[in-house]
Amino acid sequence: MTSIDLPSGAAYNDAMSEPGTYEMLSPDAAGTIAPDVVRVPRIPDVVDVDDLDWSAVRDLVDPARVRTRMRTTVERLEALLDEQRPGLLFDEDRADANDRAIRVRDLDPDAPVWIIGDLHGDLLALEAALALVHRDTAASSPARLVFLGDFFDDGGYGLEVLLRVFELIVEAPAFVCIVVGNHDEALQYTGAGFTATVDPSDFSDFLNAHRVHEWITRAGKLAVRLFATAPRALFLPDGLLVTHGGFPLTDLHAELRASGDWNDPRCLSDFTWTRAHPRARKKLPNRTSRGSQFGYEDFAAFCALSAELGRPVTHMVRGHDHVDEQYEIYPAYAAHPVLTTVALSRRLAREPFGPFERVPTIARWASAALPQVHRLHVPAELVREIYAEENDVAEPDASRQAGGAEADEATA
């Protein structure tokens, strides 16, 4: 076998801009390492977007106006879910009503599919993403939207983001798919109130604080109901795996090979909760900590297993990990490329480093390629205006810091 030295960084992206064929080592059904020929999906150039109508985007970021439509939105989505088969994007590909690891059998390459990662209450990033989608999509071929979950928690406008997604669903259910994130799955309603098994969980606190408000409570219950049956993974016909987190870790592979049960609760959980290690070859499965990670050989093993089971996977798009540039393509995963994309325009309170203003990303599906990353260069002053309170907490201005120091001296 010929050894291949794979480039890294920008050189890696340049080298992988066209698909290539490589001989790789991968395990066969018996676990024996054997050579395979793998065609590596290409990696399209990143697109920088700075020419949206930012004034129009700003006008759409109106939480009060979104709430005025809340009752109508909630009632319409409740009615849609009451029909048992709401007809969301890819629902027709489910093996049965309970299938949450959907094998998509056909996808028109000429009909655009946009993938939107973690939002965490970022109404500004959502409206910017929708503005780009609407601008770059022909009216004759409406865009399809795939959300990677995590709509709330970490401040921002969690309720309003959720309501806007509800609106998108009721307006055109066949063009919207929600892949559940860990914060979405963690939200539950017990009858006595809302709970969450994740931290931070400020959205469940918000819902409980507003239990006397009928429509906020019904919106929360509706979210729980929607997420309960929404997919955890999509297997696209070109080999792209779409998840929030990752894939079933290696300790589940033997049982999955024997059963073929993609909807095993442990598999569904791993699709949602696992994290990518950017450089490790392998990681021991560890679901008892936040760092339930996988490495690039773990993903290669999963790709081999999925092919055995009739669902070939060659590359993956995911959210979950809040990477520095809001997207990352990991050089270590060159044989089976992985894209992490996050749609955040501001630094979250739990993220201690870097500028407050971020560049959210979304991605456009392209057959036999990693989805193409689009970086939305939201004006910094707009981010600071919309999230003024969060910015004040993250970066108190110099005069306030000086005032605090003077006060400390006066009371010393």
Which residues does each predicted region cover?
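N-terminal active-site segment of His-dependent metallophosphoesterases
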Residues: 40-160, 164
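Active-site environment of divalent metal-dependent phosphoester hydrolases
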Residues: 120-124, 153-156, 183-189, 235, ...
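Short coil/turn segments at secondary-structure boundaries
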Residues: 127-131, 158-163, 190-194, 254-256, ...
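Active-site-proximal loop/helix segment associated with metal-binding centers of metalloenzymes
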Residues: 27, 31-77, 82, 197-219, ...
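Binuclear metal-dependent phosphoesterase catalytic core
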Residues: 334-412
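Active-site neighborhood of divalent metal-dependent phosphoester bond hydrolases
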Residues: 111-112, 140-144, 151-241, 248
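Active-site neighborhood of phospho(di)ester-bond hydrolases with catalytic His/Asp-centered motifs
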Residues: 115-117, 144-149, 177-182, 242-243, ...
